[in-house]
């Protein structure tokens, strides 16, 4: 807008003066007052834009974090619910203390994995996009323009890092539907007595319990979907 460009002009030392000076040219006084008002409105517009940008960014960050957390923790919640249902069934129809203790141990194992996942999610920060940040800074005229070649090189480096991160992420996916990058501490060699049992082992033990109790095949189908 033309008035924004005019308001951004820097006044020289000789342009400063009292807007109420009776001996000054009226057109010059009006121009100074107009420039002062426009500069104030530009600053107010920047402040309003920053506040609005913060609100949008916070909401987007919350939505992304909630979606990521829900995707990771959902299967653990379903598994915990299935084990809790089996525990209730055993209390009502079967007083075998061995099975009850085994289910309680599996619930504890799920809790360990959930605790690690939640702790790891809190430490995750989204990667910064160098090109976007530079463009934003240039739009605000807060620094000198960065050469195009340098921006291209930085963008290539950023894409290379993102591709490597995506490759590592894809390699860590588990067949059970749970991202193994969040549950490294849940891997184990001795499943039965490990301090950090894996989700796959918990699912196998739960399916074995379902067969041992002679429950419906639908429960096994439900476990296969986790």
Curated annotation (Swiss-Prot):
Record keywords, A-Z: Cytoplasm, Nucleus
Region (deca-GX3 motif): 45-85
Keyword flag Cell membrane: no
Transmembrane segments: none
Signal peptide interval: none
Compartmental location: Cytoplasm; Nucleus
GO cellular component, one term: nucleus
Record-linked InterPro entries: Essential_protein_Yae1_N, Yae1-like
Keyword Cytoplasm in record: yes
Major location category of this protein: cytoplasm
Swiss-Prot/TrEMBL GO biological process terms: protein maturation
Role, per record: The complex LTO1:YAE1 functions as a target specific adapter that probably recruits apo-ABCE1 to the cytosolic iron-sulfur protein assembly (CIA) complex machinery. May be required for biogenesis of the large ribosomal subunit and initiation of translation.
Quaternary structure, from the entry: Forms a complex with LTO1.
Name the UniProt record assigns to this protein: Protein YAE1 homolog
This protein's encoding gene: YAE1
């Amino acid at each position: 807008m033309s008035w924004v460009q005019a308001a951004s002009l820097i006044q020289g030392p000789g342009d400063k003066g009292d807007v109420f000076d009776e001996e000054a040219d009226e057109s010059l006084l009006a121009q100074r007052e107009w420039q002062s008002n426009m500069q104030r409105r530009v600053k107010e517009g920047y402040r309003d834009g920053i506040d609005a940008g913060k609100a949008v960014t916070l909401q987007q960050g919350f939505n992304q974090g909630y979606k990521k957390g829900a995707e990771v923790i959902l299967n653990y919640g379903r598994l915990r619910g299935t084990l809790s249902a089996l525990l209730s069934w055993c209390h009502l129809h079967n007083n075998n203390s061995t099975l009850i203790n085994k289910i309680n141990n599996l619930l504890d194992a799920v809790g360990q994995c959930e605790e690690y996942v939640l702790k790891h999610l809190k430490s995750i920060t989204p990667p910064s996009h160098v090109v976007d940040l530079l463009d934003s800074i240039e739009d605000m005229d807060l620094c000198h323009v960065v050469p195009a070649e340098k921006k291209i090189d930085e963008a290539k480096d950023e894409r290379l890092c993102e591709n490597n991160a995506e490759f590592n992420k894809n390699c860590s996916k588990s067949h059970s539907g749970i991202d193994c990058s969040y549950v490294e501490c849940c891997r184990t060699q001795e499943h039965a007595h490990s301090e950090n049992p894996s989700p796959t082992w918990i699912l196998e033990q739960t399916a074995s319990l379902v067969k041992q109790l002679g429950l419906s095949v639908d429960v096994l189908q439900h476990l296969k979907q986790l």
